[in-house]
């Protein structure tokens, strides 16, 4: 064992030394930025499109269910907002550990380890999904305990049982996305996402409108639309699309599960604290004066912000992939340069959106409402919306850098402190004590994001990238397995 680990270390050090020389290639700054930008957009472009397509699945279901009745629409919205968003955040966060592991292993040219990491992540996330299943099975009592009306709960608990299949679909969906992104092969994800979107529209019309199957028809279409891209991705991975990185099912997937689980939990905590933050914002404004108008205006602003966040999350994925690849390859300067390029690109786009929404003000609200009172409130909130969009062009990207470098544990603490010890108390104070109402609540929570962004910026600027390469090397040295496993370890030959 010691001899094998020594050989692995020697191999990785050799590759690390070779890759450090890549910076001395004689290219000027303009050429380097252009080359890095192309690598960046190979990941970011498909990731952004996939995010929009995935969000489109829920919007399409919501549109067709909305025609069945207001009770059905409210029940569907509650199920997705309260139950699915909760479990989605946990699974997406835990799957992001795969970005760190696969990205660094791919950069180190330990290609065979990507398939093993993928299988380990399948095992960890499947166990997590089973643990989350009771929230859907007992959705009725849970929603009643949260104060929802009984007539809504009767419909919601039926929808919740259908959503179990969607929740399970997140396991292959998130893990295969991370696996393919690490290799910059995520175009296939965008293609199948586009196909599933079209299939969902057709099936929803056929089952809900033409055959009048109601909720059962809408949820059947949603299940098919969620599983179709998963089947395509798994087939692509296992049937020849990733010959270097997929060597077949292996017993090694059951080895070193505890370290993978710990990294997954750290990643889950980091992402969940971010995804649940806006949900808490909605809850905090529910008891304010003129709450209906405030909530409608805030919902419009959050929907606009969420659309822009799709772009930011695309750059977050690109940052994670580029940083992890460069760290894994031993190119510390490359990791630093990739960080600078992705942050600059995302910030430039954020500045454009900042001025667009700052000057559009209430005009954009008429896309969502005809109420003058709501439009006026949106105009009042537009500076906060514009500033949120500007911060969102930086903060998720820095989180992506953290994922690529493997800092999830530290960023979880930062998120907890900035969001829940700074942002929420500030929002409560400004909204309820000072009396700024919804503007005060949002302003306080933006302050939490601002503090978090400042902390992550300082962390990134003070990072010793050579030390990050060394830490990555140690992790690879601990977890890497022989490139040609013996027959008793492999379930499927190459």
From Swiss-Prot:
UniProt topology in membrane: Multi-pass membrane protein
Pfam families given in the database record: MatE (PF01554)
Claim: Cell membrane is one of the keywords in the record: no
UniProt keyword annotation of Transmembrane present: yes
Biological processes per GO annotation: xenobiotic detoxification by transmembrane export across the plasma membrane
Region annotation (Disordered) ranges: 1-25
Subcellular location: Membrane
UniProt keyword terms in alphabetical order: Membrane, Transmembrane, Transmembrane helix, Transport
Record GO cellular component, one term: membrane
GO MF: antiporter activity; xenobiotic transmembrane transporter activity
Transmembrane segments: 40-60, 74-94, 123-143, 158-178, 188-208, 223-243, 268-288, 297-317, 340-360, 384-404, 416-436, 441-461
Family, similarity comment: Belongs to the multi antimicrobial extrusion (MATE) (TC 2.A.66.1) family.
Name this protein carries in UniProt: Protein DETOXIFICATION 23
Taxonomic source organism: Arabidopsis thaliana (Mouse-ear cress)
Gene: DTX23
């Amino acid at each position: 064992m010691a001899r094998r680990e020594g050989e692995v270390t020697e191999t990785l050090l050799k590759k690390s030394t070779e890759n450090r020389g890549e910076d001395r290639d004689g290219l000027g700054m303009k050429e380097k930025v252009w080359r890095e930008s192309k690598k960046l957009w190979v990941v970011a472009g498909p990731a952004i499109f996939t995010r929009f397509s995935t969000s489109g699945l829920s919007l399409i279901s919501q549109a067709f269910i909305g025609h069945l009745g207001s009770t059905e629409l409210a029940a569907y919205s509650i199920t997705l907002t309260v139950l699915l968003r909760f479990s989605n955040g946990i699974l997406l966060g835990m799957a992001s550990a795969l970005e760190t592991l696969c990205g660094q292993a791919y950069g180190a040219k330990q290609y065979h380890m990507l398939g093993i990491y993928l299988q380990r992540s399948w095992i960890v996330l499947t166990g997590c999904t089973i643990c989350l299943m009771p929230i859907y099975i007992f959705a009725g009592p849970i929603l009643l305990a949260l104060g929802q009306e009984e007539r809504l709960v009767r419909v919601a608990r039926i929808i919740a049982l259908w959503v179990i299949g969607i929740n399970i679909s997140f396991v292959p969906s998130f893990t295969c996305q991370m696996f393919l992104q690490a290799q910059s092969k995520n175009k296939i994800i965008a293609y199948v996402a586009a196909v599933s979107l079209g299939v969902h529209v057709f099936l929803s019309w056929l089952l809900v409108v033409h055959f009048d199957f109601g909720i059962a028809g809408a949820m059947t279409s949603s299940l098919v639309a969620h599983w179709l891209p998963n089947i395509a991705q798994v087939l692509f991975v296992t049937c020849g699309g990733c010959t270097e990185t997929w060597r077949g099912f292996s017993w090694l997937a059951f080895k070193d599960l505890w370290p993978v689980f710990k990294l997954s939990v750290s990643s889950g905590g980091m992402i969940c604290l971010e995804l649940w933050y806006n949900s808490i914002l909605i809850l905090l404004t529910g008891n304010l004066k003129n709450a209906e108008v405030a909530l409608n205006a805030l919902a419009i602003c959050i929907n606009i912000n969420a659309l822009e966040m799709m772009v930011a999350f695309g750059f977050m994925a690109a940052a994670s992939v580029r940083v992890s690849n460069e760290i894994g390859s031993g190119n510390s300067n490359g990791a630093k340069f990739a960080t600078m390029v992705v942050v600059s690109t995302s910030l430039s786009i954020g500045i454009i959106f900042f001025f667009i929404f700052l000057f559009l003000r209430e005009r954009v609200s008429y896309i969502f409402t005809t109420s003058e009172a709501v439009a006026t409130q949106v105009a009042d909130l537009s500076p906060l919306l514009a500033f949120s969009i500007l911060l969102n062009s930086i903060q998720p990207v820095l989180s992506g850098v953290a994922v690529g470098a493997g800092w999830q544990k530290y960023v979880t603490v930062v998120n907890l402190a900035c969001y829940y010890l700074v942002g929420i108390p500030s929002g409560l104070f400004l909204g309820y004590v000072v009396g700024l109402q919804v503007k005060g609540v949002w302003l306080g929570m933006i302050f939490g994001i601002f503090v978090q962004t400042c902390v992550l910026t300082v962390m990134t600027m003070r990072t010793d990238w050579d030390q990050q390469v060394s830490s990555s090397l140690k992790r690879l040295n601990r977890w890497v397995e022989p490139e040609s496993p013996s027959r008793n370890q492999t379930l499927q030959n190459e």
